[in-house]
A protein has these predicted regions:
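Conserved short histidine dyad/triad with adjacent acidic residue
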Residues: 34-38, 52-72
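A short, N-terminal "cap"/entry segment at the start of jelly-roll beta-barrel domains
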Residues: 1-52, 147-148
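Short, surface-exposed beta-strand-loop junctions and turns on beta-sheet-rich folds
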Residues: 69-70, 95, 128-130
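Short beta-strand His + acidic residue motifs that chelate non-heme Fe in jelly-roll/DSBH
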Residues: 62-63, 88-89, 105, 111-116, ...
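A short, polar/proline- and glycine-enriched secondary-structure boundary/capping micro-motif
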Residues: 61-64, 73-75, 124, 133-136
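Double-stranded beta-helix
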Residues: 116-148
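Short acidic-glycine-tyrosine-enriched beta hairpin
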Residues: 78-80, 90-111
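Glycine- and acidic-residue-biased ligand/ion/polar-headgroup-sensing regions
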Residues: 48, 56-57, 74-91
Length: 148
């Protein structure tokens, strides 16, 4: 699996249980090499979430926002670049992240991101994550795969 190898090459050690929990998100578009990502969620509770996001060269996560839910303002997230280059776009403004740099995205803020030519690894730290509620600007995008 690409993500497990990339994480280990970056010095991020995984247990066998964690390796088995790596998720692949193609956003329902079946163009994973271009649009998609792989992720490992370490913890996702009512209070916090921590995950690793792995992107291949040039791979993109589509534009979206994290809306309010259950009395919360929505997910606030901090992206910390661990490896490669991340082109983060927040409300249309580019925020390039190199290894060791981070950026916090407020709840409800439109954003998308793309890996540089060597791929990228992002550590995400956030409030509770409810991916199934994400709102994408492209109506054909689905965060949770629907099997018909």
């Amino acid at each position: 699996m690409y993500a497990a190898e990339a994480l280990e090459q970056a010095g991020i050690v995984l247990t066998e249980t964690e390796r088995a929990r790596i998720e692949v998100a193609d956003f329902g578009l079946s163009r994973l090499a271009e649009i998609g990502l792989q992720l490992l969620v370490y913890v996702n509770s009512d209070r916090c979430c921590a995950k690793e996001i792995v992107l291949g060269p040039g791979q993109t996560c589509p534009e979206h926002r994290h809306p309010p839910f259950e009395g919360t303002p929505g997910k606030e997230e901090t992206f910390r670049c661990r490896r490669g280059l991340v082109h983060l776009y927040v409300e249309g403004r580019e925020v390039p992240l190199k290894p060791g740099e981070q950026y916090t995205i407020p709840p409800g803020t439109l954003h998308w991101f793309q890996a540089g030519p060597e791929g990228a690894i992002i550590s995400e730290f956030s409030t509770q994550s409810r991916d199934e509620l994400d709102e994408f600007t492209d109506p054909s995008v689905r965060r949770v795969t629907i099997v018909e």
